[in-house]
Each structure stands twice: as C-alpha cells, then as structure tokens.
Amino acid sequence: MALRSAAVAALLGVAHTSLAQLTSTCGSRFPWEDNQLTDAVVASSNATLFGFGADADPSAKILPQPRCKLLPGDPQWPSQTVWNLFNLTLGGALIKNTPLAAPCYNNWPGVANPAACETVRTRWNDPYFHVDDPSSAMFPLYQGRTCMPTEDPSASNCTLGGYASYSVAVTKVSHIQLALNFARNANLRLVVRNTGHDFADKSIGAGALSVWTHKLKDIQFLSNYNCRGYNGPAFKIGSGVETEELYQAAEARNLTVVGGECRTVGIAGGYIAGGGHSPMSSLVGMGADQVLSLDVVLPSGRFVTVNRDAYPDLFWALRGGGGSTFGVVTSVTLAAYPKIPVTTMTFAFLTSPNVTADTFWAGVRTYMSYFDTFTAAGAYGYFLVVGIGPGQYLFNFMPMWGGNMTRPQFETLVNPFLTDLANLGIDVTPNITEYPSLYSAHSGTFPPEQVGAADSHAASRLFPKENFQPAKINETLAAVRYAIEDGAILIGYNIRSAPNPKVNQTNSVNPAWRKTTGFFILATAWAPDSPDSVIQSQSEKLTTDWMERWREVSPGAGSYMSEGDINEPNFQQSFYGEYYPRLLAIKKKYDPRGLFYAPTAVGSEEWTVQGQVPWIPTQNGRLCRV
C-alpha cells in the first residue's frame, strides 16, 4: 500500500491545478468542478489506491469482494503513513474526526475543556452547531449515543461510536474522486454527509471515510435557462447550499424556489434525493421535480453531467431514489418561479371545560375533511396534535400556508373551515398575515428547529386523499386518535405533489407522494436517561402497533424515506413503491461493488451492521454483506 513520491507529486497536482476544462451543455460548471482527477494523472502516479473503478458495464465480471468493510484496528486498516499521504493528495482536506461533545470528557486529552464543553451544552440543540461539524448527527440515537454532552467529565468515556473515522472537507471534485477511489480500493466504509438531516442517520458509519460536501456553497443565477424542454429562470447550486441560503438568493432576484421547511436542510443532498417536500409543493410539486441537471461523481470515481439526455437512467434515479446510493452530487440546477405573495395562518385549540375530547377530535376530523380542498387551491398545512394530560389534547397550526394568495383570497378559502369549527363549539382566534414573498413568509412563520436529542423515534405515512373522504375518514381518524391517546406525538402536513407541466416530473419520487394529501409523522418519546429496554419497547410499539394501524387503513400507500422509520417493515415498498426493482437494477449497474450504503437505501438489504440492539439499529458496528 506504499505510495511512491512521484505518485504523491502527481496527485498533489490534482489538488491545486485545474486539470479538466469541460463545459456543460446548458450552463457552465463551477470552477472547482473543473478540478478533476484524470486517467493521465492516475497512470503517471502509479498510485493503485486512487485508481478509478470500472465504468458501468452489465457484462463486466466483478471479482469477489471482502464480506466486511474494515474497522480501525484491523490488520488491513490503512497505516497512519497511508492516511498522511492521502491527506497530502487532498491538499490537507482530510479531517481525523473528534466527537462534537468530546470537550466534555476526560478521556480525550488535549480536547477536554470546561469552557468548550459549556459551549457544547449550550448549543447542542442548535442545528447550525451540528451542520458546521464534519461528523456530527442531528439525531444521535442511531449513532449509539456514545458521546452526548455531560456535566461530569469522569462519569463515562466518549467514543466515536457511529461517527466516521475520517472526513474529507470537499472543496473540489478531485477531493470526492480521491475519496471514493481510496474507499473502494482500500475496502473502507464510505458515507456522504451534507448537513446531517435524516431521521435514519444515513450520513454516519463506524470506521467510515466521510465525504463532507458542506463547503460547496456556490450559487449561480441563470436568468434564461433554455434547455431540454425548460425555458425560464434557474439556479445552479453547490451541494452544500441550505434551504435558507437558496431562499435568500431567490429573494434577491425577486423569484421563488422550492425548498424545505427546515432552514438547514441541504437542498442538493438528501432533500432532492429523497423527493423533497416543501411549502411550495401544493403549487408546483416536489423538490426533485425542479431538477434540470446534476453534476455527479459516480461510484467508479468518474465525474459526469446527468440530465434528460445524458445518463437518463441516473437522471431518473437521482431525483427521488434516495441518497448515498448512486453517487455524490456536486451541484444541481433547479427551476425558479416568479415572486409570489404568501398568506399564513396560525391558531391553536385544545380540550377545555367547553371542549370535550370527542369535540376536540371532531375538530381534527373537520380539518381533515378539508385536506383535498386546501391542497387543490395550492395551500399547505403544518400542524401538531399532542396529548397534554389525561384525556386532554392540543392542536396547533405552525402554520397553514397559502402560496400565491393574498389575504382576502386566503380568508375566502379558510372561512368555511373556521365556521365549521365554531359550529362544533371550537372558537379560535386565527392570526392571519400576508407576506410579499416566500422568503419573508418562511422567516416569519416557521419556528427554528431543535435537534441533538436522542429521546424520540419517528415514523411516517403518506396518506392518499381517499383516507380523508367520507368513506374512510372515520377509520383514518380512529387510527390517529388511538396513537395519540396512547402517548404518541403527531406532526402533520396537509400537502400534495401538484402536477407541473413546466418541469420534468418523470422521476423516482415515491409514487405514493403523487396521491398524498396528508403526510403524517408519528413519534414516541422517552426520558433522556432511559435505558435501552425502554427505548426498545417504545420503538417496537411505534412500528408494530401504532404504525401498523396506519398501514392497515392505507393499504398500498407509503412513507417518506427522509423522515421515516429506520425499522420500517418492507421499506422497499414503503419508501420506493413500484419503482424499487428499477432502482435496484440501476444501483447494481453503477455500483456493482456496493461502495455506497445507507440504512433503508436501495440495495441496503444486502448489508447488515453487526452487533445491533433490537429496535435500536445503530451505525456503530462493522458493516458486512448479508
């Protein structure tokens, strides 16, 4: 595994010199995308650890592969000399990871620091704190909870657990190519991390080499993108761009774009790969529908542009078929729309001496009966239903959102609903506000997200509109009520994936989204210091009791992979629907050696993480083929 000095010199040239000057057919690549590893450089270096893999070829013979990926301490694990040389080829972009909460523990000499620990404890629930770290996870339950903030530095030890051993802080395409080639040739587990937003912690893995795309922040405005059936404004963004950053860029151009509800979601990462729901979805469709072109590093290490005409199978798969599966997206070009007004409404109602539990649930049923009406008008609802005491419940709009609606138009839409609530004896005082744009509405109404806790487990269901029509609404409500009365928490969305002829909606977004008007997330929670037995019991109940009732009242529907249950039964059907066989074939075509793995991703059923606790599947074990 030794590298000759000539190899290092040649590969160092990749890190500092633009070796390829290619221009995409529609719009140009970012300058750092032209900094690529080439066959000539690999050949001149004689560095086999960084050589490309075989291009996609169904007839190519794949040699037998090791059953398991390496972990630190294995005899074949790269020596520190090799890691140092790898860092040289990257121009110093390699990071040896330290858990974010390590300053709170004495077993990290040189890192333990009371003042730094206080910062960790203060900011642990702040998503930006985790986004800016190369290895942290926003939802640490499946990391193994091996290094949580503590006030007692001697109480226990902090370990990496499910965090990656090393990360590459990507600033150019050659960084990704070198990382993929090194991981493939050295038999290392590979993970891809953008912001760390995923309920199943797809961006972590014990002993892994992580490709960290957070620094790819470029945004290019294309005023007249006229290519492959689309004609209009567009934005080309690096894969590190977050929702809030894209919204700000569109605001500066008096435009509207499709992005997430959470400010720190990475648009070109798992958001688009998972389909991407948005406050704009009821108007113009899913986030993945807006994609016009992508630039991607394939599992072979090759860098390609993917669109309707080039790699059409990947163009279909990358828009909804799941992240950490087909390659590493470096940038994406997205459709944009004219600036629109947005009117929002917030209110809450709860049980009281005048509102019985049955009346409360009648109010929830009333709202559900308007789901199709509201989404057909382009509206979107974000709400919470939770128990607040024995037989007591709260409903809270956070908010309802009327895209491309003035206040009078919005009030015309919602007044019949408010009247129906009043007729039940539920009097609410709605706070209705008209905003001039999506960005101002998003900033003014959506609460900041809270992350970092390991005290809950969530699952989700994509309910089709039939579930909220007279024949099935009572059955649906009963399944929801059962879970809430048993202690569950519901975060709901009244949303649809609107048809949109302006963009290409022939993609791999879960077909269940195209029929959905109710996307419901159900969570169970426990005390932060609960033992594994409590977490196991609650997680099992969520999956096999509460969610099973939801599956029974919505046969053939699905779940949203990015906010789904890591224990989802038959995840292939739930997260991918009828598209799974096609997606699996594309996966095997472009990644025959299984370089990319993530829990519940396409092809993940062929792998297992060893040493799992039932119902709490962490990523802190060895990854092996089944």
Locations of regions flagged by a protein language model:
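Soluble FAD-dependent oxygen oxidases
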Residues: L19-V626
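Fungal secretory targeting signals
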Residues: M1-L22
